[in-house]
């Protein structure tokens, strides 16, 4: 099976737990950057917060060196994800734009308070004429 043949609508994970060294700041980060993607804060219980499929918990050791990629429904959501995060004082790890990771791969990156690389991705299949092709490693 190839990248082109994969059914990208399939769910691979039910949820992900992220342990935070600064729980409140991590909740603020994810609340800020997930809102433009339509991902709500569903539940908060003391030292644990649920953002749809992502749980943020006040646990040690903190999760680090992780790359999380969230689906965006439009380029504008990717742009707003990055704008909201940087406006709130969080660090950019790459501005919105097309990447050479695949056709129509439009993404932006932010670093959460523990240094995890958090990405918003829109697969712009209607705009593949920008010369970027699949990149496989």
Label every model-predicted segment.
Residues 1-27, 68, 124-137:
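N-terminal beta-strand motif that seeds the catalytic metal site of vicinal oxygen chelate
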């Amino acid at each position: 099976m190839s990248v082109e043949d994969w059914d990208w609508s399939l769910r691979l994970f039910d949820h992900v737990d992220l342990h935070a060294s600064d729980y409140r700041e991590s909740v603020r980060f994810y609340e800020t950057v997930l809102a433009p993607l339509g991902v709500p804060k569903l539940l908060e219980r003391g030292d644990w917060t649920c953002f749809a499929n992502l749980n943020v918990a006040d646990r040690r050791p903190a999760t680090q060196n992780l790359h999380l990629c969230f689906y965006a429904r439009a380029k504008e959501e990717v742009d707003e994800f990055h704008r909201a995060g940087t406006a709130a004082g969080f660090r950019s790890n790459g501005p919105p734009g097309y990447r050479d990771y695949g056709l129509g791969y439009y993404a932006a990156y932010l670093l959460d308070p523990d240094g995890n690389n958090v990405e918003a991705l829109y697969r712009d299949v209607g705009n593949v004429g920008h010369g970027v092709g699949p990149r496989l490693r």
